[in-house]
Amino acid sequence: MPMSDAETLEGARARAAAAARTAAPPYLAIGLEGGLSSEPLETLTSWAAATDGVRWGYGSGGRIVLPDAIAREVRGGRELGDVIDEAAGHAIRGTRGAWGLLTIDLVGRRDAFITATIAALAPFYNPTLYR
């Protein structure tokens, strides 16, 4: 799991680049990545990267502070998915995700990436301002 904003953004960029390599033009490839950031607080964050092969757009979603016990486990080397599955008592990593667990499903895993994706696409749907 990425352990900083820079690592999380790089993961999103790598996923978008990989998607772009499999697409036929014209395309718009998007990569999503979740990770941890410890500045100024230990938070779960989401980044999105988008490319059309020439231009790039980036966006970050909301953040949520991780409970100390979960943050400690992840910083100690455990996968966040394993930790949240254990905390929930069953597998939720691919459905509710950490966001769903932490917010009692007010915000879900999918929701966490919506703002990031919309922000990453801004240079494509609003090109006049992003010249």
Kindly give the residue locations of the regions a language model identified.
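Anionic-ligand binding patches
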Residues: 2-131
